[in-house]
A protein has these predicted regions:
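Serine/threonine-rich, repeat-prone extracellular segments and beta-strand-based repeat modules
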Residues: 67-101, 142-181
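Substrate-binding cleft of extracellular glycoside hydrolase catalytic domains
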Residues: 205-230, 236-327, 335-337
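Solvent-exposed, low-complexity, repeat-rich "mucin-like" stalks and linkers
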Residues: 29-68, 111-142, 189-191
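Functionally critical loop-and-helix segments that line ligand-binding/catalytic clefts
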Residues: 191-215, 356-402
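Interdomain boundary/hinge segments at the C-termini of tandem beta-sandwich modules
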Residues: 105-109, 181-185
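Hydrophobic alpha-helical membrane-insertion segments, chiefly the h-region
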Residues: 15-28
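Aromatic-lined carbohydrate-recognition surfaces of secreted/lumenal glycan-active proteins
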Residues: 334-351
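N-terminal Sec-pathway targeting helices
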Residues: 1-17
Length: 402
């Protein structure tokens, strides 16, 4: 028995020595590697100044003029937050040493705020809101740019006033605009001319297009059979929206009738939701509400994020970047629940407000031939179409591309 114990002890000692030796060898090799790295030749020339515009798409290699080796990973750099950012990377130098390196990158916002203001701005006499509330003033990064109107004016009296408006963002970028304020009598609304659906259909129907309409309560009780006979190939139906910022959700009074009616005549259905989201989290809430309302319905086409509160934009306290992210959150939340989403907006806002994105787009541009240069899936051509089956008001005419 004693002999067995001695043998076991010897084996344990041998094992301990082997493990200790391996550990010591590993530490020694780590030391050698640290020394190699410490003494490695590093030759890297960066762009000067090491400064990049906010939200610009760049890779690590875009910042390097020359390097004595090859990058292990030429990764994309996140430039979504203004300020100083530490960048860490590794590369194999000319001695075949894997060298870690870090540097500071300054991310800056040099884009001026936007004042949605022409040379002449008209308001109705008796308007109680301040001009700073009425005139759209926004920024790509700053949720709350400073917006000031200078000069004397009186909204309770008809007249003309020479004024200046200034917008300053978080980074000190400034936009200044001189304009003529006209305080005028309210004008009576005049009816606009209409265009027959059949004329538009013949003009825009091709092998590459589908012709449709979008509807809400404003189209009243629709005769779906007549709509089908007129040649409508798809429809976007208003599901509902929200009663202002943080207001209650509502379902369009004609939604149920419309979706069941269009389904009964086999017209493919998409939806749109009128959003008042003032944050990414609110847009997600919007999307989840939408998903909850449409359970049990088969939705054939995308569900559009319809955000067009431009006349009240200043009260939302949201940057163009965060607004664009909000649209993305709405679309991505729909996608995670099995639905396609898209962004609805007009040409001017798509070009000047919404930041670069890869969202499927429903373009609103009321013209015979759009010159919008971005990509779009559908085009809302006019809001003045007349079609058999809708006797209350006109209807929006849409073209979708196959």
């Amino acid at each position: 028995m004693k002999k067995i114990v001695k043998v076991i002890l010897k084996l344990l000692i041998i094992i301990a020595l082997i493990i200790g030796g391996i550990f010591a060898y590993k530490k020694y090799m780590e030391y050698l590697e640290e020394e190699r790295i410490k003494n490695a030749i590093i030759k890297i020339d960066f762009i000067t100044p090491l400064e990049i515009e906010y939200n610009k798409e760049i890779k690590l290699s875009d910042l390097i003029i020359s390097i004595n080796g090859e990058l292990i990973d030429d990764f994309k750099i996140d430039t979504s937050i203004v300020g100083e950012k530490e960048i860490n990377f590794k590369y194999i130098n000319e001695e075949n040493i894997k060298v870690p390196y870090k540097f500071k990158l300054n991310i800056v916002d040099k884009t001026q705020p936007i004042l949605w203001l022409s040379d002449v701005y008209s308001v109705n006499v008796g308007t109680t809101k301040k001009l700073e509330e009425l005139i759209m003033c926004g920024d790509d990064y700053d949720d709350n740019p400073t917006c000031i109107v200078t000069g004397e004016y009186d909204l309770s009296k008809i007249g003309s006033y020479n004024l200046t408006m200034e917008a300053i963002d978080f980074s000190g970028n400034k936009t200044t605009k001189d304009f003529l304020l006209k305080v005028v009598k309210p004008k009576s609304s005049s009816s606009s001319s209409t265009i027959s659906f059949s004329y538009l259909y013949n003009q825009y129907k091709s092998d590459n297009t589908l012709i449709g309409i979008d509807v809400s309560k404003w189209q009243g009780d629709i005769d779906f059979e007549k709509i089908k006979e007129a040649g409508v190939e798809f429809v976007f139906i208003k599901l509902g929206g929200q009663n202002g910022i943080d207001g209650d959700y509502y379902i369009d009074p004609k939604f149920e009738r419309n979706i069941e009616g269009f389904k009964s005549v086999n017209i493919p259905v998409g939806l749109y939701f009128y959003s008042y989201a003032n944050s990414v989290s609110k847009a997600k809430e919007d999307a989840l509400w939408v998903v909850d309302q449409i359970k049990g319905y088969e939705i054939d086409l995308p569900i559009a994020f319809d955000w067009e509160n431009w006349s009240k934009f200043n009260s939302f306290h949201i940057s163009f970047n965060n607004l664009t992210k909000a649209a993305g959150e709405f679309i991505n939340t729909l996608k995670s629940n099995g639905y396609d989403g898209m962004l609805y907006s007009s040409k001017n806002y798509l070009e000047k407000i919404w930041l670069k994105n890869n969202y499927s787009t429903w373009l609103a541009h009321y013209t015979s031939n759009t010159d919008y240069e971005g990509t779009f899936k559908c085009w809302q051509r006019t809001s003045s179409a007349k079609i058999p089956g809708i006797t209350v008001n006109t209807v929006d005419f849409d073209i979708c591309y196959k």
